[in-house]
Design a protein with these regions (language model features):
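An acidic- and aromatic-residue-enriched active-site/binding cleft used to recognize and process polar
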Residues: 9-11, 35-37, 76, 103-105, ...
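Active-site-proximal binding-pocket segments
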Residues: 239-433, 439
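Beta-rich, aromatic/charged-enriched effector core domains that present basic-aromatic interfaces
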Residues: 70, 78-209, 389-394, 398, ...
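N-terminal beta-strand-loop-alpha-helix module at the start
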Residues: 1-69, 483, 493, 503
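Glycine/tryptophan-enriched, flexible segments
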Residues: 145-308, 421, 425-531, 536, ...
Length: 547
């Protein structure tokens, strides 16, 4: 009698789950399970993201129990877990079939290869499916003539050639499962600190609720242009995301990317709407682009031997990195964003622009890989391909980066492309030392007269740090360093991409090089006729997959 295991990994959902559908169609008995792999320990995963994972597992278990099944949660090395499941020593008899979705991260490839060999040696039928992206990443990269995409135009061409996106799959009728034990652990069993009460509840049901809430406002979906969203949240709540807030749910697969795509498409159908890269479809396409780059480019996560990375002699100062990570640089906007990240696991994409630029080419001249590691641990929506792609982009070292001389001002004014609210409420929420500081000085408190500082109960240099660097001096020095590196041959041997294809621009697109971050106009090309475009029309702009 066939017993099929469904290994939940990055598709923590019942809807649009091809592995689950195939398992139900193949075997009378189906065992849904998740493995808490010690590879992803506390040194690599922050408490907020781990809590989101556990909440997602609990939600999945609740939905399965409502169908008289359940989720088994095993803890240990995957190979050791499967050795028992394949031999019949596990709690549910011997697995004869194993189904799961593909994972293209480097560690996952090695892990899955070992599991596949173990399955083969044990006579277990194994089948994998592409469930975390619109495109089958490996199949796309393997096609003759494939070139790594470095712009919206190139990823649109690849996606269009792949054909229409299939509709999401319905939840199948899952057979009952009666096995005791192997419960979802509590966060307190793993971490000594409590997760934030702010942020996002994990789970498929919450993901679908949020998607429905977003799509209920059809005008919002049609008008969405990510560069125009506020980095400091909605007007009524400066710390509430001004974007969809769906990125953590896509990261964990609580929400199918196909479901999101088709839901947005339904809203836009027959209406004038924004276009990629600024649109919601554009956000998904950039995610696809980074997944393809991560799979196709060797050492995509490194600053050496990476064809997508200019070789820059970055500094290595642990004190500067720690000040940035902990939100004590003396620049309130930067510090508020980093404290938001530490407390909630979330940061708006323009905030990510600001802090990444500040750490690297803008002010502190630290290696982008150090910032990448901080984001990788703390972000709820941290995703290997997307995180590396964005840091390459924002550090100015990738072929799809903006010109390196376009640097964000860490003290954003009302005309800044960082779209920061000017009342200071966001800063005051996350940097309470400045809660009584006048809005006039909130982004540059060191310029406030001493009387103002005393009135606010915050003496700069005592109650809140002085700026860790002088922005203007650091900016000029870093521009000279970057130019010198380029002049000395920092360009890798091969960047790839088509001649004349500029790649995605940041929110500076269209502006001439110069001081500040004013930039130029952002292009938009709405489909005024309301005609449906499968992949959308390309346009310059900026985006960040996540946030």
């Amino acid at each position: 009698m066939a017993t099929a295991g469904v290994w939940f990994r990055k598709c923590l959902r019942l809807h649009d789950n091809e592995a689950l559908v195939k398992a139900v169609a193949t075997a009378k008995d189906v065992v849904p399970f998740f493995i808490l792999d010690p590879h992803f320990d506390k040194s690599k995963v922050g408490v907020n993201r781990f809590n989101f994972l556990l909440e997602s597992l609990k939600d999945l278990d609740e939905q399965l129990r409502a169908r008289k099944s359940r989720l088994l949660v095993f803890q240990g090395q995957p190979e050791e877990v499967f050795a028992e499941l394949f031999s019949g020593k596990g709690p549910c008899g011997r697995l004869t079939h194993l189904f799961f979705e593909k994972d293209t991260e480097p560690y996952a490839r090695l892990r899955d290869a070992r599991v596949a060999q173990l399955a083969k040696d044990s006579g277990v039928h194994l089948e994998t499916f592409s469930g975390h992206t619109l495109l089958d990443v490996d199949a796309t990269v393997a096609k003759p003539g494939f070139k790594p995409p470095i712009s919206m135009k190139s990823i649109q061409n690849i996606a269009t050639a792949a054909g229409p996106i299939r509709a999401p799959l319905d939840v199948p009728k899952i057979p009952p499962l009666s096995v005791e034990g192997f419960q979802v652990p509590s966060i307190g069993e793993i971490y000594a600190v409590e997760p934030s009460s702010q942020g996002f509840p994990g789970g498929e049901q919450e993901a679908l609720r949020r998607l429905a809430q977003v799509c209920a406002d059809v005008d919002y979906v049609c008008r969405f242009e990510k560069p125009k969203t506020a980095s400091t949240g909605r007007p009524k709540s400066p710390w509430e995301p001004s974007t969809t807030g769906l990125s953590p749910y896509l990261k964990f697969g609580c929400l199918s990317v196909r479901s999101a795509w088709h839901a947005f498409d339904q809203c836009m159908r027959g209406r004038s709407h924004s276009q990629p890269p600024q649109s919601l479809h554009g956000q998904i396409l950039f995610r696809e682009m980074f997944y393809l780059l991560g799979a196709a480019v060797p050492n995509f996560d490194q600053d050496q031997q990476n064809s997508m990375c200019k070789v820059i002699p970055w500094g290595n100062d642990p004190e500067l990195l720690a000040a940035w990570q902990e939100g004590r640089t003396g620049y309130p906007f930067i510090d508020a964003l980093m404290r938001q990240l530490n407390q909630t696991g979330f940061m708006h994409h323009l905030g990510r622009h600001a802090v990444a630029c500040f750490l690297t080419r803008g002010d502190l001249w630290q290696n982008w890989t150090a910032g990448r590691d901080v984001f990788d641990k703390l972000l709820l929506d941290s995703d290997w391909a997307v995180n590396n792609g964005n840091w390459l982009w924002l550090a100015g070292v990738a072929p799809f980066s903006a010109p390196y001389f376009r640097i964000y001002d860490p003290c954003p004014g009302p005309k800044s492309s960082l779209n920061a609210e000017q009342t200071g409420e966001f800063v005051k929420h996350y940097v309470p030392e400045l809660k009584d500081m006048s809005a006039k000085y909130i982004y540059k408190p060191w310029t406030a007269p001493l009387a103002e500082q005393k009135k606010a109960g915050c003496i700069i240099g005592q109650d809140y740090p002085k700026p860790i660097v002088d922005h203007q001096k650091a900016r000029e020095a870093n521009l000279a360093r970057f130019k010198a590196a380029l002049d000395s041959g920092a360009l890798p041997e091969k960047f790839g991409g088509a001649k004349g294809d500029p790649g995605p621009m940041t929110s500076f697109s269209g502006g001439k090089g110069g001081k500040g971050d004013k930039g130029g106009k952002r292009a938009a090309s709405p489909d005024a006729g309301g005609r449906k475009r499968r992949w959308g029309k390309g346009a310059k702009g900026d985006t960040l997959a996540g946030g």
